[in-house]
């Protein structure tokens, strides 16, 4: 058999395991400009032709192929979606796309029509928030059900803050509500006041503009965490972090408040399961209920997702904190990096990729 024919036979056979394996995806382009995904220790082909673009989460990737077709790959199979021009968004678990005014979505292999009068939409891990211009309503898709949040009488707009599994929105009387796990909880009525809602997963926090008290919505309950003004606050997965007026950094989760830093930090950040901050030129992280010194310098670039921190190290390479353990991945300078699940993808300048997964380094 000619080598060329043998190569393409191997590539096509490579699709067979995709139908039975699905433990998260890590999509990237290889040195042949093929679209591949790292799974189960191997880089497996998804498309053997160049693609136009892609958007990916931990479990699915949607992409436009060279013919302009929208497709989904969920770690098991490729799914043809449409040949028409689309606007699409992807989260770790869901995908929504709009063709003209028709808004449709994909959830665990099932396609659903959300509305034929759609406009703006936002896709998160567990829900999709979208506008329906036919009824002038703001709607939500959650747990395989569609529900109207509010009908707007003074002009429809995407007047909502959306977290991974909750939504804060306002009705016609300027009363704010939280939608969480299929239930609606009233926050309060505020007219001209500006509110800064920070949303994560299962939690939301805000500062009351009247009393300056700091409140947390925690799995269906409102908790007044501080009765005095605070500087800054953010929400993660089941917890919030905030900085008080004295520069102290606090972590709140499940009714417990923990001091992270007693020094005025010039930078801190939160996403999903991890919090990072600078303290006296040291870079710290809070992961798995543990305070960890990550570096003796401030990284020029970093990324947070799930329980992973990946950052540019002092020599320009890539290092990562994964589930509380620090790893040096590569010394190649200025490489791009991304996070999928608990895996770190590093795209090298020579058009090859490195994946750090389960304590090992894989390359294509």
Predicted features and spans:
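N-terminal secretory signal peptides that target proteins for export/translocation
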Residues: 1-2
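Sec-dependent N-terminal signal peptides
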Residues: 5-18
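Boundary at the C-terminal end of the N-terminal hydrophobic targeting segment
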Residues: 20-22
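Repeated scaffold domains used in trafficking and secretory/extracellular systems
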Residues: 48-58, 83-93, 116-127, 153-165, ...
